[in-house]
């Protein structure tokens, strides 16, 4: 436990450089992963909308030919 506290805090009670760099890397990684997750979700939504529109058009054409 002492090692962990020594890793987190320096002698003057400030957050150590290693710990602050670790936190910064974790936060930046989370931001990058979130960006790509949102980007992928938007692309998937757009692709699904295209499929729905195509299916709707095919169904509409098929039903318009029925007399």
From Swiss-Prot:
Which segments of the protein form a coiled coil according to its record? none
Which positions carry the propeptide annotation?
1-13
Protein name as catalogued: Probable pilin MJ1400
Organism from which the protein derives: Methanocaldococcus jannaschii (strain ATCC 43067 / DSM 2661 / JAL-1 / JCM 10045 / NBRC 100440)
Localization per record: Secreted; Cell surface; Fimbrium
On the tree of life, the source organism's domain of life is Archaea
Processing and modification events after translation? The N-terminus is cleaved by the prepilin peptidase EppA, which recognizes the class III signal sequence.
Q: Keywords in alphabetical order, please.
A: Fimbrium, Secreted
- Cross-referenced InterPro entries: Class3_signal_pept_motif (IPR007166)
Gene Ontology terms: cellular component: cell surface; extracellular region; membrane
Main location, first listed in the record: secreted
Q: Where does motif QXSXEXXXL map? A: 14-22
Entry comment, domain topic: Contains an amino terminal motif QXSXEXXXL, which is part of a class III signal sequence.
């Amino acid at each position: 436990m002492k090692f962990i506290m020594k890793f987190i805090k320096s002698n003057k009670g400030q957050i150590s450089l290693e710990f602050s760099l670790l936190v910064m890397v974790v936060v930046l990684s989370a931001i990058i992963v979130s960006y790509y997750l949102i980007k992928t979700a938007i692309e998937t939504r757009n692709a699904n909308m295209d499929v729905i529109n195509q299916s709707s058009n095919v169904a509409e054409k098929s039903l318009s030919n029925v007399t």
